[in-house]
Design a protein with these regions (language model features):
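Short, flexible, solvent-exposed loop/turn segments with mixed acidic/basic and small polar residues
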Residues: 7-11, 40-41
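Residue-level preference for short coil/turn positions at secondary-structure junctions
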Residues: 15-16, 70, 133, 181-183
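Anionic-ligand-binding alpha/beta catalytic cores of soluble enzymes and soluble regulatory domains
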Residues: 24, 29-171
Length: 239
C-alpha cells in the first residue's frame, strides 16, 4: 500500500508534536470500508493523481494555461557518446557531477513548445517517433530552450550515484540525529520510489547524498528524503 510519509518531509518536531494521524495505521482498503459503512460518498472515489489543487486537468495542460509557449529543439544524444565512457572518481563531488550538454552532442530529432514544461526522466509529451525504444529527457536548458533526450530507460545519461543539497535546503525532522560524520541511511528521490541504501556526507555549505547504486532521473528542484529504520528523519531540495 502507498504511504504518504514522504510528503511530510518538511515538517519539524514542533509541528509533529501537535499532529495526530488517526488512520495512519490502517491500509487504504480498510479506510474505504469504514467510509462505505458510514455512507460517505468518497468511499468509491478514485485515488487522486498528480496535483490535486489543479482540478480535472493534466499538469502539462495546466502549465500551458499559465506559461507562454516557445518553440525549441529536441536534441537526441547517443548512448555511446564519449562523455559516458568517463569513470568518475569515487568521491561524493565527482559522483554528483551532472552531465553538461551542448547542441553539438547530438542530432535534432524534433521540436517542443518550451523547455520549462519538461523534467529529467520524462517520457510523455515529446511526440518524437522512429526509435526502437522510447525517448527520455536527459536534461533541459531553459536559457537556450533546448531539451536533450536519450533512447531507452537504461540510457547512461539518466543515471548518477549522488546528488548535492545546499545547506539552506537541508531539513532535519530529527535534528538530534544530525552529524558531521558520514551516515548510512535509506533514501528516495521521488514519491513511491523504493528506498535505496545511501550515505550522507555533510560539508560546510551543504550535503552530498551518495547511493550504493546509480539512480535514474535525479532532477534538480525535487526533494530527496532519507530514513533510518523506516523513519523519515530528513530531506532536502536537490541542487
Amino acid at each position: 500500500a502507498a504511504s504518504d510519509v514522504y510528503k511530510r518531509q518538511q515538517l519539524n518536531q514542533a509541528q509533529l508534536a501537535k499532529t495526530l494521524f488517526p488512520i495512519g495505521g490502517l491500509q487504504k482498503s480498510e479506510v474505504r470500508n469504514i467510509a462505505a459503512e458510514q455512507g460517505l460518498v468518497t468511499a468509491e472515489k478514485r485515488d487522486s493523481q498528480g496535483l490535486c489543487f489543479v482540478g480535472k486537468v493534466s499538469l502539462p495542460d495546466f502549465l500551458q494555461q499559465k506559461l507562454a509557449t516557445k518553440k525549441g529543439d529536441i536534441v537526441q544524444v547517443a548512448n555511446t557518446h564519449p562523455m559516458y565512457a568517463k569513470t568518475p572518481e569515487n568521491t561524493p563531488a565527482s559522483l554528483a557531477e551532472k552531465f553538461v550538454y551542448s547542441p553539438e552532442d547530438g542530432n535534432v530529432v524534433g521540436t517542443h513548445n518550451g523547455a520549462h514544461f519538461f523534467t529529467v526522466g520524462q517520457r510523455k509529451g515529446l511526440a518524437v517517433g522512429g526509435t526502437k525504444e522510447p525517448l527520455f529527457v536527459l536534461a533541459t536548458d531553459v536559457q537556450k530552450n533546448i531539451i536533450y533526450v536519450g533512447e531507452g530507460k537504461d540510457h547512461p545519461g539518466l543515471y548518477r550515484r549522488a546528488l548535492w543539497i545546499d545547506q539552506a535546503d537541508v531539513h532535519w525532522i530529527r535534528p538530534d540525529l544530525q552529524t558531521d560524520q558520514p551516515m548510512m541511511v535509506q533514501a528516495r528521490i521521488r514519491y513511491r520510489q523504493p528506498l535505496a541504501k545511501a550515505r550522507l556526507h555533510q560539508e560546510e555549505n551543504g550535503m552530498y547524498l551518495v547511493f550504493d547504486t546509480p539512480q535514474s532521473a535525479i532532477a534538480a528542484g525535487q526533494f530527496a528524503a532519507w530514513y533510518l529504520d523506516n523513519e523519515l528523519i530528513g530531506s532536502g531540495v536537490i541542487g
